[in-house]
């Protein structure tokens, strides 16, 4: 009996409850998302977008199927993207994009999981320069068969770390670096490629951690560089397309010194094998397989002053001529460009509005507006479902197209009627009209936003709702002019500002 009493609690503590958020048709969330939903699975060619959801603390697995897309974008604040669970997995077969080029502060991408597997396309794009991002993708099982692109618009001192320190990453695809410094802290196995574009640098910081001899470092356009730790037992690293008339540099973390007495030179090139050997202090070195056809007279010892790299005087070598066998190896995929994320814009027009609000015991309500517009730009159509997302009976999510017409006004006349008495009041106000189209069915939402904090717009039941004005056209959680929402489900008041009336046609859906 005593044993059974002990075993049952132990078994109970091992039980876990998991949930999955399945996206089977395109969905966009603006400003907020509940990351407590657990695992996220994007399927059936769907796309899932999180726009201006600044603190993305994922709490489950991520699975992106083939032909699906997951977009996380920040157009204002710094984006904080975190996975901090050594039991979770990330598997991408489609396209995953993190876009922070418009952020006003440095962003963070800190991924610590059990398994990271990419057979699709991943693009992590950052502003860079003085806004140096933190980039870390650590997993005990780290495999890339697709393309992983780490992109900075302007190079910064940011150092990208891939894998667990002292562990192993497996790369059979392409890791693209654009204006990015990456520090090797693991073994690298596989016959894949690391492509260095523009001002990128790769630092082989621990030469005792082997890099597969069939793995390729590709030096692309711009002035990319490679720097390796000099050791007494050198490796041979395969480098493609070295040259670019002196723009490319390969070096060590120590000066390339020649010791005349010992007959040791700081560098040598074997015209029969295509091996370039760099030597520091005459005894410790590294070897680079750059290929055949180079003219030894065109090599020159130089200094690598790349941003983020420890500058070593006379620690590198360049080739003052084009690569004799220039070109991108077939193993190195073309680095994908950074797409432009969806943005929300609005146009302003001058109008005069009149609102009529009637409250009776049955809580019926109506609204009528008239407007005179000036010659301003037409409203912009954006794609989002954060304002009013719909859930279909089978649990999938539908695509929503929203037309937002943001207008301004000087005076609104409000007439509140109850107990056979009506009381007109006036107040400055703003008006936003939202047309939501989902599966060819439209919902029109009109938002009135008084510019005073003390105007009472109406009575719903026995509640008096005192409405203020949200900051900008979009309020908390992405809702336009949140506050009182009246639809087929009745009226509901919130503690925030704005007045919202919905002419709901979704009889069988839920917001």
UniProtKB/Swiss-Prot annotation:
It comes from the Eukaryota. Belongs to the HYR1/IFF family. InterPro entries: Flocculin_t3_rpt (IPR025928), Hyphal-reg_cell_wall_N (IPR021031). The gene is IFF11. Transmembrane segments: none annotated. Induction: Repressed by HAP43. GPI-anchored cell wall protein involved in cell wall organization, hyphal growth, as well as in host-fungal interaction and virulence. The lineage of its organism: Eukaryota, Fungi, Dikarya, Ascomycota, Saccharomycotina. Residues 349-392 have a biased composition (Low complexity). Residues 349-397 are annotated as: Disordered. The keyword Signal applies. Disruption phenotype: Leads to hypersensitivity to cell wall-damaging agents and highly attenuated in a murine model of systemic infection. This is Cell wall protein IFF11. Pfam families: Flocculin_t3 (PF13928), Hyphal_reg_CWP (PF11765). GO terms for cellular component: cell surface; extracellular region; fungal-type cell wall. It is found in: Secreted, Cell wall. O-glycosylated. Residues 1-19 form the signal peptide. The keyword Glycoprotein applies. IFF11 differs from other HYR1/IFF family members in lacking a GPI-anchor. Keywords: Cell wall, Glycoprotein, Secreted, Signal, Virulence. Its main location: secreted. Glycans are attached at residue 245.
């Amino acid at each position: 009996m005593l044993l059974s009493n002990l075993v049952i609690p132990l078994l109970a503590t091992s039980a876990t409850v998991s949930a999955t958020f399945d996206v089977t048709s395109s969905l966009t969330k603006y400003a907020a998302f509940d990351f407590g939903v657990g695992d996220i699975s994007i399927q059936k060619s769907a796309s899932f977008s999180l726009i201006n959801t600044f603190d993305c603390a994922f709490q489950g697995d991520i699975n992106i199927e083939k032909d699906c897309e997951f977009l996380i974008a920040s157009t204002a604040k710094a984006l904080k993207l975190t996975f901090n669970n050594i039991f979770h997995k990330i598997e991408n077969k489609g396209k995953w994009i993190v876009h922070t080029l418009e952020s006003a502060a440095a962003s963070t991408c800190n991924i610590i999981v059990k398994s990271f597997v990419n057979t699709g396309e991943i693009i992590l794009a950052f502003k860079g320069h003085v806004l140096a991002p933190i980039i870390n993708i650590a997993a005990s099982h780290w495999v890339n068969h697709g393309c992983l692109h780490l992109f900075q618009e302007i190079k910064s001192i940011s150092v990208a770390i891939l894998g667990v320190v002292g562990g192993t990453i497996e790369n059979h695809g392409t890791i693209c670096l654009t204006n990015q410094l990456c520090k090797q802290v693991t073994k690298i196995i596989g016959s894949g490629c690391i492509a260095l574009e523009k001002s990128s640098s790769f630092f082989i910081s621990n030469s005792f951690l082997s890099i597969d001899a069939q793995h390729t470092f590709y030096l692309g356009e711009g002035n990319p560089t490679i720097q390796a730790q000099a050791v007494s037992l050198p490796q041979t690293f395969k480098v493609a397309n070295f040259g670019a008339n002196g723009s490319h540099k390969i070096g060590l973390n120590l000066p390339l010194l020649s010791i005349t007495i010992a007959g040791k030179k700081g560098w040598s090139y074997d015209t029969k094998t295509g091996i370039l050997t760099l030597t520091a202090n005459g005894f410790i070195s590294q070897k680079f397989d750059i290929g055949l056809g180079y003219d030894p007279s065109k090599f020159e010892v130089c200094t690598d002053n790349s941003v983020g790299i420890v500058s070593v005087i006379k620690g590198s070598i360049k080739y003052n001529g084009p690569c004799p066998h220039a070109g991108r190896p077939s193993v190195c995929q073309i680095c994908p460009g950074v797409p432009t994320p969806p943005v929300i814009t609005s146009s302003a027009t001058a109008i005069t509005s009149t609102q009529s609000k009637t409250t009776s015991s049955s809580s019926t309500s109506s609204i009528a507006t008239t407007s005179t517009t000036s010659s301003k730009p037409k409203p912009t159509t954006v794609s989002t479902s954060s304002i009013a997302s719909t859930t279909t009976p089978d649990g999938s999510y539908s695509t929503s197209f929203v037309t937002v017409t943001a207008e301004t006004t000087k005076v609104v006349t409000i007439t509140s009627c109850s107990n056979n008495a009506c009381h007109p009041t006036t107040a400055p106000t703003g008006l936003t009209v939202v047309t939501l189209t989902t599966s060819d069915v439209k919902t029109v939402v009109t938002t009135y936003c008084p510019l005073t904090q003390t105007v009472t717009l109406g009575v719903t039941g026995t509640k008096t709702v005192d409405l203020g004005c949200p900051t900008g056209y979009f309020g908390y959680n992405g809702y336009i002019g949140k506050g009182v929402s009246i639809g087929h489900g009745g009226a509901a008041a919130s503690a925030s500002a704005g007045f919202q009336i919905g002419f709901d046609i979704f009889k069988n859906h839920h917001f």
